[in-house]
């Protein structure tokens, strides 16, 4: 069998994942406004795809052509563009369908041509009061450098200023970062109707207010467009320059990085399209997409709650972990010292972690706090706690990952603020991104230092903890806390040798240990012992690990995969992956936690990890996976995994055809895993 048939290209697999998101927008069992929000998620995902995956492919094509190599990448480019075009057509159809369904529910997203006289007057006042100060036209002249001026993934209106036979062009930025994208209009009869208008259409309606008095014209026509840039960096790590200075420079470079996608309104005149293409230096390798009237659908993620309560998801109140509320514990440290605690977001509240760090910031017994941050919330209480701890005389070390894609600017801000507060801030070594989710609190108890550790699968972020599924393990077990201490030492001194007996740490030992554990399952299967591998991942694309799973399947090891995003492995290939079952779940929460389970001859090993099975995570990042040593917590994770694999509502097969077929229910009971997990955890947190 040829090599190309053993793996799905990661770019196509990623697009298949985003098509699953689009399926959620099409799913009529989802509430109407949630379906509209899934359109926003799809659009946001696609923007990131072009910034990262597509841009990387474009670079590969340019390099391969310079070297005179084969055309595989160009062929893949064609497949991508074809698949995106098909999905975009489905997207447009779904959007129109949802608009009709909204109207049936008395929610009207109207355009500038559908305004009543009263609404027209109201809009002109709104424009002058809230919007005009944010609008400055960019005139397109022969020397205008649009690549320099235009912002990445912002929607613009390209305006024709027509005077007789002369046409001038200008661009208007739609300032959705300063003014709400959705604006509620005064209702008309009947009063139950809820009219809204997009910011784009307010600008269309108010073109005269923008240009009148400055230009003579017979007509003004506006067409939407946006441009997506390559999000990668070209960092040259000079010894005398700090990483923060380099990152600030690279952020400036991103503002002028090469465009990789140009999306424009389908009825934009050809002459204007050509002017924009030329000004944006769009090459034959870039994606040029004629689209609808609106771009930046990512704002639809925040489509407002309007109308009846059943148009949005029924709330699932976040649950407190009952162990922290027991009367005998004076604080969170007492509870964790008694036994390990496992939190599973967003079912559990993130408040427990925030509260523990708040307590640590002023507890007289706390000596030191170490934490690494990758993506934190905009108004991060964790950052506040670290600053308060430093003010209270604690020794605070914060490892800031300046290379967290799309969060670099925020992390530079946090690093400066922490440094000013007296916190010891350190950065990752060049080329070694820190993706682990750790903190370590050192506390003086009865004359000895006791350490408390957090190992997680997700970021210390209050916002995403309400949307992403992730685990937090809180432990005072010295077997784990001593090794977390070693991880922080490794971060500060990445080239000193370090060993671990319990933790799986990239790039130190992850690949070796994963290979060894898969090989052990193969040996057990061959000897007739219990064997099996179950993985829950965001992405599975490392060919070495995929090949190891193929070898396991060929040896009779049952392999169960739950992969949300990219999966290069192809299940059910005869003689290669017959024993591999792979599914994906897309639902109201984003499945983000990573779990590795090995049967281990009947004594299961269960790991929680920050690392996907991607080459970068295994070999080029600092990642941490922890074993669950407490049998109670191990069983809890196994129960949750069982629920996920029993899903008969939101589970899809991963297959060679990228079909996204739903797993058939057959005669099994209806199980929507995320709701079932909520009920399971709720049952565990009942008072005894």
Swiss-Prot record:
> Catalytic residues?
435
Q: Please name the InterPro entries in this protein's record.
A: PLipase_D/transphosphatidylase, PP_kinase, PP_kinase_C_1, PP_kinase_middle, PP_kinase_middle_dom_sf, PPK_C_dom2, PPK_N_dom, PPK_N_dom_sf
Does the keyword Metal-binding feature in the UniProt annotation? yes
Q: Which residue range or ranges hold the PLD phosphodiesterase domain?
A: 430-464
Give the result of residue 488 to A, as annotated.
Answer: Loss of enzyme activity
- A single Gene Ontology CC term: plasma membrane
| Modification after translation (UniProt) | An intermediate of this reaction is the autophosphorylated ppk in which a phosphate is covalently linked to a histidine residue through a N-P bond.
Q: Which cofactor does it need?
A: Mg(2+)
Q: Which family does it belong to?
A: Belongs to the polyphosphate kinase 1 (PPK1) family.
The annotated subunit structure for this chain is:
Homotetramer. Dimer of dimers. The diverse functions of this enzyme involve different subunit organizations and conformations.
Q: What is this protein called?
A: Polyphosphate kinase
User: In which organism is this protein found?
Assistant: Escherichia coli (strain K12)
Which gene underlies this protein? ppk
């Amino acid at each position: 069998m040829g090599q190309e048939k053993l793996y799905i290209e990661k770019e196509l697999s990623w697009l298949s994942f985003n098509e699953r998101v689009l399926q959620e927008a099409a799913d009529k069992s989802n509430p109407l406004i949630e379906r509209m929000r899934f359109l926003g998620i799809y659009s946001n995902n696609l923007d990131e795809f072009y910034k990262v995956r597509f841009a990387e492919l474009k670079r590969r094509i340019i390099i391969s052509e310079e070297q005179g190599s084969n055309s595989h990448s160009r062929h893949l480019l064609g497949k991508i563009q074809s698949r995106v075009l098909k999905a975009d057509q489905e997207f447009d159809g779904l959007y129109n369908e949802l608009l009709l369904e909204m109207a049936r529910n008395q929610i009207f997203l109207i355009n500038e041509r559908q305004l009543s006289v009263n609404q027209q007057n109201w809009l002109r006042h709104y424009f002058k009061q809230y919007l005009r100060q944010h609008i400055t036209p960019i005139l397109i002249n022969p020397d205008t450098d649009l690549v320099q001026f235009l912002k990445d993934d912002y929607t613009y209106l390209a305006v024709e200023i027509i005077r007789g036979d002369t046409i001038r062009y200008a661009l208007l930025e739609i300032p959705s970062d300063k003014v709400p994208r959705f604006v509620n209009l005064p209702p008309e009869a009947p009063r139950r109707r809820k009219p809204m208008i997009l910011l784009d259409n307010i600008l269309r309606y108010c073109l005269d207010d923008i240009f009148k008095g400055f230009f003579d014209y017979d007509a003004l026509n506006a067409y939407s467009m946006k441009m997506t840039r390559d999000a990668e960096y070209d960092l040259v790590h000079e010894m005398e320059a700090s990483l923060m200075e380099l990152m600030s420079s690279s952020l400036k470079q991103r503002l002028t990085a090469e465009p990789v996608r140009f999306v424009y309104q389908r009825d934009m005149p050809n002459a204007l399209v050509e002017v924009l293409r030329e000004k944006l230096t769009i090459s034959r390798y870039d994606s040029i997409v004629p689209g609808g009237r609106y771009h930046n659908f990512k704002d639809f993620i925040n489509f407002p709650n309007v109308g009846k309560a059943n148009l949005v998801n029924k709330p699932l109140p976040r649950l407190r972990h009952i162990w922290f509320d027991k009367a005998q514990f004076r604080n969170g440290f007492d509870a964790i010292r008694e036994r390990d605690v496992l939190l599973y977001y967003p079912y559990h509240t993130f408040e427990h972690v925030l509260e523990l760090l708040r307590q640590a910031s002023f507890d007289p017994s706390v000596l030191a706090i170490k934490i690494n941050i990758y993506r934190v919330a905009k108004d991060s209480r964790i950052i506040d706690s670290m600053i308060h701890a430093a003010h209270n005389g604690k020794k605070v070390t914060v490892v800031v990952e300046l290379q967290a894609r799309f969060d670099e600017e925020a992390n530079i801000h946090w690093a400066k603020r922490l440094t000013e507060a007296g916190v010891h801030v350190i950065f990752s070594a060049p080329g070694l991104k820190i993706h682990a989710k750790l903190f370590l609190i050192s506390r003086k108890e009865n004359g000895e230092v006791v350490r408390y550790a957090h190992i997680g699968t997700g970021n210390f972020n209050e916002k995403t903890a309400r949307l992403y599924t992730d685990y937090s393990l809180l432990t005072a077990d010295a077997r784990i806390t001593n090794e977390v201490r070693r991880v922080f030492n490794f971060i500060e001194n990445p080239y000193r040798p370090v060993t671990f007996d319990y933790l799986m740490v990239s790039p130190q030992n992850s690949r070796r240990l994963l290979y060894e554990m898969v090989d052990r399952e193969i040996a057990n299967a061959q000897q007739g012992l219990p064997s099996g591998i179950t993985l829950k991942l965001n992405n599975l694309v490392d060919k070495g690990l995929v090949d190891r799973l193929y070898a396991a399947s060929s040896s009779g090891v049952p392999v169960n995969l739950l992969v949300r995003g990219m999966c290069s492995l192809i299940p059910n290939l005869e003689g290669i992956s017959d024993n591999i079952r792979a599914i994906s779940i897309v639902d109201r929460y984003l499945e983000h936690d990573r779990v590795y389970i090995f049967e281990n001859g009947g004594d299961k090993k269960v790991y929680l990890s920050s690392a996907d099975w991607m080459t970068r995570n295994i070999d080029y990042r600092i990642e941490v996976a922890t074993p669950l040593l407490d049998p109670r917590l191990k069983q809890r994770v196994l129960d949750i995994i069982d629920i996920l694999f029993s899903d008969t509502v939101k589970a899809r097969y991963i297959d060679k055809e990228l079909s996204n077929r739903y797993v058939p229910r057959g005669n099994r009971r209806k199980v929507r895993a995320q709701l079932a997990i909520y009920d399971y955890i709720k049952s565990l947190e009942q008072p005894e």
